[in-house]
């Protein structure tokens, strides 16, 4: 299987199913049944099946980013959970992952918009991935909203969350290495579980060069990190 092939190459496959309503088109008709009994049964079955297929991986990424109306203006069908419903569904997903003996993992951008609520309600057991794809990291000179995006790395550290900071070559070519440089200083090593790159290009032939560039950036950042 593909998972066996990946492991033979020394890679650790981690499942990711994004349950945010902005990104759940993969659920097909069930994406239009959000927060119903049928939806919860389907999502629980999916999490259990994927957990078994991946052989009880260390982590399970649940997505949960960008669930705001502003991110869905180009979609013909838009739905947004918020307030207690969003948190209730997140806790449901977390519980289903933990039932399978796996640590849940989410994107952290909810904290950009409602930091007080986030830090009051987000369990420390959930691995966090803040993301920022720009080129500047100086909090003294950054303008909003970029300053908020970068500062969240520091805020997650201040509140004691484990992190996998995320960079990208989606917008600029130097972001990933700069992300590593910044977070190596901002995050305690005991809470820095790694880094992730997200080129946000499909795995198609015409995008191959962008993926190669991303891999090269990771390699360069690793060499600098290990010095």
Regions found by a protein language model. Give the residues of each.
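Short, flexible/disordered intra-domain loops and linkers
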Residues: 73-80, 136-145, 208-210
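Glycoside hydrolase catalytic-domain groove-lining segments
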Residues: 115-169, 175
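Aromatic-lined carbohydrate-binding surfaces of glycoside hydrolases
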Residues: 1-127, 132
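Well-ordered, non-membrane alpha-helical segments in soluble/globular domains
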Residues: 1, 39-44, 82-92, 143-152, ...
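Polar/charged alpha-helical tracts
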Residues: 52, 99, 151-154, 158, ...
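A generic secondary-structure signal
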Residues: 49-53, 96, 155, 181-186
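Substrate-binding cleft of secreted/luminal carbohydrate-active enzymes
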Residues: 159-227
């Amino acid at each position: 299987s593909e998972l066996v092939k990946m492991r033979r190459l020394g890679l650790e496959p981690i499942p990711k199913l994004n349950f945010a309503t902005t990104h759940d088109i993969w659920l097909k008709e069930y994406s239009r049944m959000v927060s119903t009994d049928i939806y919860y049964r389907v999502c629980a079955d999916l999490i259990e099946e994927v957990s078994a297929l991946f052989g009880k991986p260390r982590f399970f990424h649940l997505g949960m980013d960008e669930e705001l109306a502003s991110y869905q203006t180009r979609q013909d069908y838009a739905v947004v959970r918020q307030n207690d419903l969003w948190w209730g569904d997140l806790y449901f997903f977390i519980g289903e992952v933990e039932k399978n003996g796996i640590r849940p993992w989410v994107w952290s951008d909810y904290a950009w918009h409602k930091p007080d609520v986030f830090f009051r309600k987000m369990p420390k057991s959930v691995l966090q991935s803040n993301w920022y794809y720009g080129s500047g990291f100086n909090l003294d000179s950054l303008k909003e909203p970029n300053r908020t995006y970068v500062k969240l790395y520091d805020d997650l550290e201040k509140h004691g969350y484990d992190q996998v900071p995320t960079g990208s070559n989606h917008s600029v070519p130097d972001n990933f290495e700069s992300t590593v440089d910044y977070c190596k200083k901002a995050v305690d090593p005991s809470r820095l579980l790694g880094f992730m790159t997200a080129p946000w290009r499909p795995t198609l032939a015409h995008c191959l060069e962008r993926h190669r560039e991303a891999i090269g950036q990771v390699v360069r950042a690793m060499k600098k990190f290990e010095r």
